[in-house]
Amino acid sequence: MKKATLVIGVIGADCHAVGNKVLDRVFSNHDFRVINLGVMVSQDEYIDAAIETGADAIVVSSIYGHGDIDCLGMRERCIERGLGDILLYVGGNLVVGKHDFADVETKFKEMGFDRVFAPSHDLEDVCQLMAHDINQRHDVDTRILEEAI
């Protein structure tokens, strides 16, 4: 069976590399194929890599607190580039200052992200949730294909 492919990186002007390396290791150890773009990644770089690799999901990290600015319009850009149905995940310290995480989560979901993870979210759970989402997406795609045949 084909491994699910994740495009990961740290968005915008954020140069926090350590967490990104941790994510790469954890995701790889959970049998994901990881395309790690590193730090200071633009929206278009994520999308280009997702197109080139046939990725199942894009995982955006932001630690410096400007994720809300850097991620604005990402779903729309995915749609424009033909990836309207790609799974979009975001996590980290996404906004400057202290905010109730429920408000942050709502904001990013309204921006088109499928799941939003707080900095303290357990990575085992993140892996399970992503695997579930990807498997569910593949099951739907398979049923649609079978119905079309």
Swiss-Prot record:
Pfam family of the protein (one): B12-binding
SUPFAM superfamilies found in the cross-reference section: Cobalamin (vitamin B12)-binding domain
InterPro entries the record matches: Cobalamin-bd (IPR006158), Cobalamin-bd_sf (IPR036724), GlmS (IPR006394)
Keywords: Cobalamin, Cobalt, Isomerase, Metal-binding
Top EC category: isomerase
Keyword Isomerase: yes
EC number: 5.4.99.1
Reaction catalysis annotation: (2S,3S)-3-methyl-L-aspartate = L-glutamate
Names of the cofactor(s): adenosylcob(III)alamin
GO BP annotations, alphabetical order: anaerobic glutamate catabolic process; glutamate catabolic process via L-citramalate
Chain residues that bind adenosylcob(III)alamin: A13, D14, C15, H16, A17, S61, S62, I63, N93, L94, V95, V96, G97
Gene Ontology molecular functions: cobalamin binding; metal ion binding; methylaspartate mutase activity
Annotated Gene3D superfamilies: Cobalamin-binding domain
Residue ranges constituting the B12-binding domain according to the UniProt record: 3-140
Pathway of action: Amino-acid degradation; L-glutamate degradation via mesaconate pathway; acetate and pyruvate from L-glutamate: step 1/4
Function: Catalyzes the carbon skeleton rearrangement of L-glutamate to L-threo-3-methylaspartate ((2S,3S)-3-methylaspartate).
Protein family according to the UniProt entry: Belongs to the methylaspartate mutase GlmS subunit family.
NCBIfam families in the cross-refs: MthylAspMutase, PRK02261.1
Quaternary context: Heterotetramer composed of 2 epsilon subunits (GlmE) and 2 sigma subunits (GlmS). GlmE exists as a homodimer and GlmS as a monomer.
Protein name: Glutamate mutase sigma subunit
Organism: Escherichia coli O157:H7
Lineage: Bacteria, Pseudomonadati, Pseudomonadota, Gammaproteobacteria, Enterobacterales
